[in-house]
């Protein structure tokens, strides 16, 4: 493209005009470009493409996501209502009521630290590759490709597994809703599978739409998710107050019911699985940054907003559930969904069915947002030649200007994973359990390298940064994840059966071991990290040429000032 910005449409006016700049004005425009000021139109179509070019990539997406738009997708990925429903087992099963409250409260602090460290990196390197690009840049000389390879594959495994797990959960809740009015209904595995595939295909269609439409859909979805949370919380409290069924505060804050064979303190750490799994999607703004206006500011803000708002809302929901869960034994011993058993206990069947319906809608919204985020990861990796069939996957659709092929690829992989429904719940749960572990390993690798190996003088901070608190906050984030990853791989008993075993190590370690062997035998010879990472400009360095094949055209100053629109 010869010029990125030759005309700008101002949709709010009715008269056309053309502005021809004087030589002084052209000089001022050049000065603006040199100081990396944001230059984009009111629609957010263009946002400092030279900034992306300095990172080595060509602007291929339309930047139509505002701060609210990118936050909407990220918040939808968290899916607070279905996430609370799905992770109720982790909070209750290990230590009872306190697992709901203390796990969220303590873990939330450290998860926000992780989000802040990630956001700082995002501000400095707002690319779709995100974490794996940063790992290559921060790593000591010679280690960049391996650090990037590990981060990239861990991130992709976490996202590609997390997305079908959401749709499987939604399908399970739909079938579970049938049993509320028909207790004799027996759920068949083929029904579960076909329903999950139908939801997956529906989400695939939505994820293929242009960014502008995706932004609007997820904007509405955010309002719906917020309304559903409010309705669910008020309804639960209303029925609890009507029936005078509130649990005493001393019981929910201090009555530990340790069902594991580990010490109570360790069991509490096991219950951290609930907030960690819920928060494993707040990296979405990083991967959508190339579609976001003012990305170096809005994308990191969206990451932190998602973590803080999601954490607070999630904790409030945990408190509501804890105070209204009068018969904890019946919920913990149910053969079906704990969430369904809890709702039926807390309110009449029709009201329970209504709240369950809202949870299902939120889960479907969550699934499409997760597919959007995972497709951007696949696109960015294919752009750098990591994935098989990268030439096809890394293509941007010329009509929608979104990575449609990456969406289709991830949809196919998700459907293949859903075939594990026929292998039984133990196998399915084992696969779906690795999502949070894989995601947080990917989150932490670049943060750890930044904290321990990268000098402050070598880190070109973005406009959103932590200043002098960067390293301390990063150290807290890395320490928390380093502690939790092994713990999340433990079973709840000391001599587990196949059903009691935590298969996370095997299910995550197997694919990662395969990728490491692949790297050792073949990939190390041709994979040198993200193609553009070698062109990252550190403080004091001159701008380097954009890597061949991903060159971005920088508009001239006069081109940027040629504005044609409607007054």
Swiss-Prot record:
<comment type="similarity">
    <text>Belongs to the amino acid-polyamine-organocation (APC) superfamily.</text>
</comment>
<feature type="transmembrane region" description="Helical">
    <location>
        <begin position="503"/>
        <end position="523"/>
    </location>
</feature>
<keyword id="KW-0812">Transmembrane</keyword>
<keyword id="KW-0029">Amino-acid transport</keyword>
<feature type="transmembrane region" description="Helical">
    <location>
        <begin position="220"/>
        <end position="240"/>
    </location>
</feature>
<protein>
    <recommendedName>
        <fullName>Uncharacterized amino-acid permease C1039.01</fullName>
    </recommendedName>
</protein>
<keyword id="KW-1133">Transmembrane helix</keyword>
<feature type="transmembrane region" description="Helical">
    <location>
        <begin position="302"/>
        <end position="322"/>
    </location>
</feature>
<feature type="transmembrane region" description="Helical">
    <location>
        <begin position="65"/>
        <end position="85"/>
    </location>
</feature>
<dbReference type="GO" id="GO:0015185">
    <property type="term" value="F:gamma-aminobutyric acid transmembrane transporter activity"/>
</dbReference>
<dbReference type="InterPro" id="IPR002293">
    <property type="entry name" value="AA/rel_permease1"/>
</dbReference>
<dbReference type="Pfam" id="PF13520">
    <property type="entry name" value="AA_permease_2"/>
</dbReference>
<dbReference type="GO" id="GO:0003333">
    <property type="term" value="P:amino acid transmembrane transport"/>
</dbReference>
<dbReference type="GO" id="GO:0015812">
    <property type="term" value="P:gamma-aminobutyric acid transport"/>
</dbReference>
<feature type="transmembrane region" description="Helical">
    <location>
        <begin position="434"/>
        <end position="454"/>
    </location>
</feature>
<feature type="transmembrane region" description="Helical">
    <location>
        <begin position="473"/>
        <end position="493"/>
    </location>
</feature>
<dbReference type="GO" id="GO:0005737">
    <property type="term" value="C:cytoplasm"/>
</dbReference>
<feature type="transmembrane region" description="Helical">
    <location>
        <begin position="412"/>
        <end position="432"/>
    </location>
</feature>
<keyword id="KW-0472">Membrane</keyword>
<feature type="transmembrane region" description="Helical">
    <location>
        <begin position="353"/>
        <end position="373"/>
    </location>
</feature>
<dbReference type="GO" id="GO:0015171">
    <property type="term" value="F:amino acid transmembrane transporter activity"/>
</dbReference>
<dbReference type="GO" id="GO:0016020">
    <property type="term" value="C:membrane"/>
</dbReference>
<feature type="transmembrane region" description="Helical">
    <location>
        <begin position="190"/>
        <end position="210"/>
    </location>
</feature>
<feature type="transmembrane region" description="Helical">
    <location>
        <begin position="92"/>
        <end position="112"/>
    </location>
</feature>
<keyword id="KW-0813">Transport</keyword>
């Amino acid at each position: 493209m010869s010029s990125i910005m030759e005309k700008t449409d101002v949709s709010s006016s009715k008269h056309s005009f053309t502005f021809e700049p004087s030589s002084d004005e052209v000089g001022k425009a050049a000065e603006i470009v040199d100081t990396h000021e944001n230059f984009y139109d009111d629609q957010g179509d263009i946002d400092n493409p030279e900034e992306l070019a300095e990172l080595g990539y060509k602007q291929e997406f339309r930047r139509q996501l505002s701060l609210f738009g990118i936050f909407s997708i990220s918040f939808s990925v968290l899916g607070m209502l279905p996430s609370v429903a799905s992770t109720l087992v982790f909070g209750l099963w290990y230590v009872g009521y306190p697992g709901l409250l203390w796990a969220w409260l303590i873990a939330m602090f450290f998860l926000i630290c992780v989000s802040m460290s990630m956001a700082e990196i995002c501000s400095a390197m707002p690319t779709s590759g995100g974490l794996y690009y940063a790992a290559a840049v921060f790593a000591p000389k010679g280690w960049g490709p391996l650090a990037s390879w590990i981060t990239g594959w861990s991130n992709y495994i976490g996202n590609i597994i997390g997305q079908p797990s959401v749709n499987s959960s939604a399908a399970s809740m739909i079938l579970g809703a049938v049993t509320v009015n028909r207790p004799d209904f027996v759920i068949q595995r083929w029904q579960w599978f076909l329903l999950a595939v139908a939801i997956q295909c529906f989400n695939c269609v939505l994820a293929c739409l242009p960014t502008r439409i995706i932004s609007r859909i997820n904007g509405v979805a955010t309002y719906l998710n917020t309304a559903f949370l409010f309705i669910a919380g008020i309804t639960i409290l209303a029925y609890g107050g009507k029936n005078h069924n509130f649990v005493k505060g001393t019981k929910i804050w201090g009555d530990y019911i340790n069902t594991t064979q580990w010490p109570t303190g360790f069991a509490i750490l096991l219950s951290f699985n609930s907030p960690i799994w819920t928060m494993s999607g707040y990296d979405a703004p990083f991967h959508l940054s190339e579609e976001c206006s003012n990305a170096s500011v809005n994308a990191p803000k969206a990451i932190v907003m998602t973590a803080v708002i999601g954490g607070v809302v999630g904790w409030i929901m945990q408190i509501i559930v804890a105070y209204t869960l009068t018969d904890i034994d019946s919920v913990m011993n149910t053969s079906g969904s704990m969430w369904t058993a809890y709702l039926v206990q807390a309110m009449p069947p029709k009201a329970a069915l209504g709240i369950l319906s809202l949870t299902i809608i939120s889960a479907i919204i969550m699934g499409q947002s997760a597919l959007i985020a995972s497709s951007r990861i696949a696109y960015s990796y294919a752009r750098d030649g990591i994935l098989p069939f990268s030439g096809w996957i890394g293509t941007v659709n010329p009509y929608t200007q979104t990575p449609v092929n990456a969406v289709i690829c991830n949809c196919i992989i998700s459907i293949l994973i859903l075939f594990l429904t026929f292998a039984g719940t133990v196998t399915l749960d084992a696969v779906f359990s690795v999502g949070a572990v894989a995601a947080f390993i990917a989150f932490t690798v670049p943060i750890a390298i930044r904290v321990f190996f990268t000098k402050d003088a070598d880190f070109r901070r973005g406009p959103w940064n932590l200043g002098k608190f960067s390293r301390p906050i990063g150290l807290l984030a890395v320490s928390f994840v380093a502690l939790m990853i092994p713990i999340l791989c433990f079973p709840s008993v000391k001599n587990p059966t196949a059903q009691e075993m935590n298969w996370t190590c095997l299910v995550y370690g197997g694919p990662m071991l395969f990728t490491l062997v692949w790297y050792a035998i073949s990939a190390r010879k041709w994979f040198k990290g993200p193609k553009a990472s070698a062109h990252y400009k550190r403080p004091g360095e001159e701008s380097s040429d954009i890597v061949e094949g991903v060159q971005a055209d920088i508009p001239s100053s006069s081109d940027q000032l040629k504005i044609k629109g409607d007054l």
